[in-house]
Amino acid sequence: DNKGLCETILNLNKNIASVAIINKQGRPIEKISRPEFINPFPDYMSELFCMHCVLQISMGRDFDEQYGPINYHISERPNMTLLTFPLADSVIVVSVSKNIGPISLAKKIAKITSNKEKN
């Protein structure tokens, strides 16, 4: 269940601002956020942003045979970090405040997503 997966990830750490599952067309199919972190984007910005995240993971899959599958992708910006994870035909996008080391968190989330794909 997508909502349960989003809640599980959000509850891993209080520095996680939001979790979204995006389909391969770049449309969110589930979103959850902490109220204290909400920073609204205009609809067109959210759509472009989601398509960017999907395209990034999708293009990376072109090299799975050569290098192995992507576990996660980290994008650090001045005021937030974005983590993206492949999940079957969708992508999980997690936004995180700058108060946490992204690699250890990304590894925890990747473990959850790989267990989800096995079930």
Ranges and model annotations:
Residues D1-N119:
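Non-catalytic interaction/Regulatory regions outside core domains
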